[in-house]
Amino acid sequence: SFFKRFRINMKIHHEVISIHPESKTVSVKNLENGEIFEENYDKLILSPGAKPTQPRFPGVGIDKLFTLRTVEDTFRIKEYINKNHPKSAVLAGGGFIGLELAENLRELGMDVTIVQLLKQLMNPFDPDMASMIHNEMRKHGIKLVLGYTVEGFKEKDDGVEVLLKDNPSLQADMVVLAIGVTPDTVLAKEAGLELGIKESIVVNDRMETSVPDIYAAGDAVQVKHYVTGNDALISLAGPANKQGRIIADNICGGDSRYLGSQGSSVIKVFDMTAATTGINETNAKKSGLEVDTVILSPMSHAGYYPGGKVMTMKVVFEKESYRLLGAQIIGYEGVDKRIDVLATAIHAGLNATQLKDLDLAYAPPYSSAKDPVNMAGFMIDNIAKGTLKQWHLEDMDKISKDKDVVLIDVRTVCEFSRGHIDGFKNIPVDELRERISEIEKGKPVYLICQSGLRSYIASRILEGNGYETYNFSGGFRFYDAVVNDRALIERAYACGMDY
């Protein structure tokens, strides 16, 4: 038993109902018989976690509406499904819980719709990278209703009506709320502890609260973001476990410090893996940082070895200093190990250009001689040296209409015919030297290819011949995925449906 091994007395079916810091006691209620008694403490650790955000919508609380936080919540949902055999579900919220639940319900054969206030799923990712997640969800039959506001619910004989602001309502046999979590800090507030963001518990780097001899850890505490130093709420199991160890060490006379949360996370999205660490481009700019990014599409392992899969990587770094700030990776193989390398690099304070120098394990079944992380480093190093100048998706509208620039697509004729951007002239990279006279001198040349590699080669050829060039970050593959996704979202937003 737990007590026999660790000499820790576990009291299940008991609830702490109040904390008395002045007497160093807690009031405890036995949930089986209603008895209330006092327990003394020398040191008190609070780890109440977070509770599902409960919006004050009409209809919250009806029988066919669920929240998902605990194992017991899972049992309730599963019991309802096994008993009632629902054919459809609406999930309000597009974060980790929403996506994981959507996949599981879809595997049961249910029609699943996700409603999200933002125009993207998975807020830790930038909107452009989230497009890859949207595409995977749609590919597996998940309906996305992005940019919509839920206003309430009505119970019907045949299910639930989900009321949307200024749009037709949705119908489903069941609804699950997965719109985020809120620190569960009622006890802490009543005990007079200092509270921070969303009434989370404020702690120092020793995980001590504002009240002596009371510590706190987990989803209920406010932490410092490791990259920005700003106060943050980061509800992840990894940081919570580390915080618990630090508290135990300090209670036992040690002096351990929590350095902050980096937000490293990974999620399975059907056959795909999506992972992130540090801060994304959106939040970096909100923090007032001057940033740049590289977007690349490397293979998960050597291309000549069977089974390799393309992944999409976005690495965020600070201009001038080239401080590594964050990364996002989406793909079907090898995503998790690359994000872990980048998370380690950020924690170690590596300069983004130093990624090129990392000595990473290589064999054809597992990687390439230049690992995807190395490739990101080479690209950033080229930017630092002035060898590579980029242009980005947000520049497309302006650049594509500029009469004082030259637009060249260096993919093959076949690739170009399958889809291209208006205004671009097709000169395949292998014909570039012979056709260089077709490119007007004296004007900047903006290049694009499928992934960014051939357009980089073209830029080196043209730069060697006296041209000023800019390479499109991410290539046509990235552009096509993002633009098509945005078109689907906007069309759905205008029409009221994404299906």
Q: Where are these predicted regions, by residue range?
A:
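Glycine-rich dinucleotide-binding loop and its adjacent helix/turn
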Residues: 46-108, 197, 203-205, 425-429, ...
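Mid-to-C-terminal Rossmann-like scaffold of FAD/NAD(P)H-dependent oxidoreductases
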Residues: 220-333, 364-368, 372-398, 405
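Short hydrophobic core segments
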Residues: 39-49, 92, 170-180, 244, ...
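Rossmann-like dinucleotide-binding cores of NAD(P)H-dependent redox enzymes
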Residues: 1, 88-89, 96-154, 234-240, ...
